[in-house]
């Protein structure tokens, strides 16, 4: 039997994925579920529910997000402080006017993440932008429409750490 442990450092390395909503044809829910899987790390071979091995996700062009039906006028987001009479209801239009289209995507992804202690850390790795410009361009190593691959400098640094 082989005693080789393998290069698990490559599997645990956090990659930066880029999702361009303008190029992506998926609706809000389908896009949010794919992003949630990447943030959780379920696409990795070393995934375990108790470990946070997910990747970063940068989403651009959120203003081009697709929703079906009349959700912009009819879907409501609610929050409650716990005190009587403090229920706050906001339509999707109001949320977009106040905080932008990225907030809608963040709320959708947040609802698809497990409700545990790792949720906030995973949401912090989601970076959303209404336009096409973002400050993380140099970090992005994987694109939503491509097979994810590990860049050579990252491979070399991880292999050097393992030696």
Swiss-Prot record:
It comes from the Eukaryota. GO terms for biological process: mitochondrial translation; negative regulation of translation. GO terms for cellular component: mitochondrial inner membrane; mitochondrial large ribosomal subunit; mitochondrion; ribosome. It is found in: Mitochondrion. Residues 2-4 form a propeptide. The modification N-acetylserine is found at residue 2. One of its GO terms (molecular function) is structural constituent of ribosome. Keywords: Acetylation, Mitochondrion, Ribonucleoprotein, Ribosomal protein. InterPro entries: Ribosomal_uL13 (IPR005822), Ribosomal_uL13_bac-type (IPR005823), Ribosomal_uL13_CS (IPR023563), Ribosomal_uL13_sf (IPR036899). HAMAP family: Ribosomal_uL13. Present with 6700 molecules/cell in log phase SD medium. Component of the mitochondrial ribosome (mitoribosome), a dedicated translation machinery responsible for the synthesis of mitochondrial genome-encoded proteins, including at least some of the essential transmembrane subunits of the mitochondrial respiratory chain. The mitoribosomes are attached to the mitochondrial inner membrane and translation products are cotranslationally integrated into the membrane. Belongs to the universal ribosomal protein uL13 family. Component of the mitochondrial large ribosomal subunit (mt-LSU). Mature yeast 74S mitochondrial ribosomes consist of a small (37S) and a large (54S) subunit. The 37S small subunit contains a 15S ribosomal RNA (15S mt-rRNA) and 34 different proteins. The 54S large subunit contains a 21S rRNA (21S mt-rRNA) and 46 different proteins. PANTHER family: LARGE RIBOSOMAL SUBUNIT PROTEIN UL13M (PTHR11545:SF2), RIBOSOMAL PROTEIN L13 (PTHR11545). This is Large ribosomal subunit protein uL13m. It comes from Saccharomyces cerevisiae (strain ATCC 204508 / S288c). The lineage of its organism: Eukaryota, Fungi, Dikarya, Ascomycota, Saccharomycotina.
């Amino acid at each position: 039997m082989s005693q080789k442990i393998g290069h698990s450092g490559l599997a645990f390395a956090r990659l930066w994925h880029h999702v361009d909503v303008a190029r992506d044809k998926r609706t809000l829910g389908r896009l949010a579920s794919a992003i949630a899987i990447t943030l959780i790390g379920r696409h990795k071979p070393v995934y375990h529910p108790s470990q946070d091995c997910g990747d970063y996700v940068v989403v651009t062009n959120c203003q081009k997000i697709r929703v079906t039906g009349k959700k912009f006028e009819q879907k409501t987001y609610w929050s409650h402080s716990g005190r009587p009479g403090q229920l706050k209801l906001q339509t999707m239009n109001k949320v977009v006017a106040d905080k932008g289209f990225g907030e809608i995507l963040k709320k959708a992804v947040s609802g698809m993440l497990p409700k545990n202690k790792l949720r906030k850390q995973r949401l912090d790795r989601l970076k959303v932008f209404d336009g096409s410009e973002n400050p993380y361009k140099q970090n992005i190593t994987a694109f939503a429409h491509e097979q994810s691959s590990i860049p050579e400098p990252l491979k070399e640094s991880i292999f050097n750490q393992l030696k």
